[in-house]
Amino acid sequence: MIIKFNFDWICFDTKYAFSQIETYFEIMNGQIEDIKKKNMESIRSLLENVKDIEDYEFQSSTLFQEHYHQYEENLPRCLTYSFVTMIYTTLETRLNELCNDLFKRKNLKLALKNLKGSLADRVELFFKALDLKGLGKKDIDKITEFSRIRNQIIHENGQMHNATKKLKNYVKNKNNITTKNNQLVIETSYCLEHLKYFKKMFSNAFKELGYKQDYTIETNEKKDI
């Protein structure tokens, strides 16, 4: 039996990679919510057995502060930081794969690995030098801005003490990123916004570059996969 895939595998792999990140986040976020709820129930159960008023006030204050710090600040921050890191890693990997595939497919004379600079700089130069369609200025700007956030997380654990003026202005003008105690606080919406954008960016790029994205297969009849 002959099976015909009506898509290029690089398109499928890219779509799947970003979908996996979204699934991971949904699972992890749900687990944090469950643990948070159980911890609050444990605190209330423990406090029910405290009869002395002063002791109750001391323990409740301590336990509720610890709960807030852990489940409203620490864990959400760790989750969104890991989310940003995973999105960036996938973005970098898939851009490398796209450029390498174009290099082989079109028998180009310039490879991405021969270029220097940031991820956005190298990709922009690669597309411009070879007069390729698919990625525009808005896409490059998005990659650049997201890279700065990722780098601040990786190299400074989100601390903004040594942040560049460009990064500070970017954070100041975004409504889903703030700072608290001079550390980045990233909302879930920021991560989902960029995950959605990069998925669409690749889809548009594949279309303009002539890749097949009809995610169906054919044998004796056409079936969705």
What are these regions (language model features)?
Residues 1-85, 137-144, 148, 164-225:
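Extended intrinsically disordered or low-complexity regions, especially N/C-terminal cytosolic tails and loops
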Residues 78-98:
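Ordered, amphipathic secondary-structure segments that act as subunit-interaction surfaces
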Residues 90, 150-153:
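Conserved short aromatic-hydrophobic micro-motifs
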Residues 95-148, 155-156:
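Short non-catalytic regulatory patches outside canonical folded cores
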Residues 154-164:
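Substrate-binding/catalytic groove segments of enzymes
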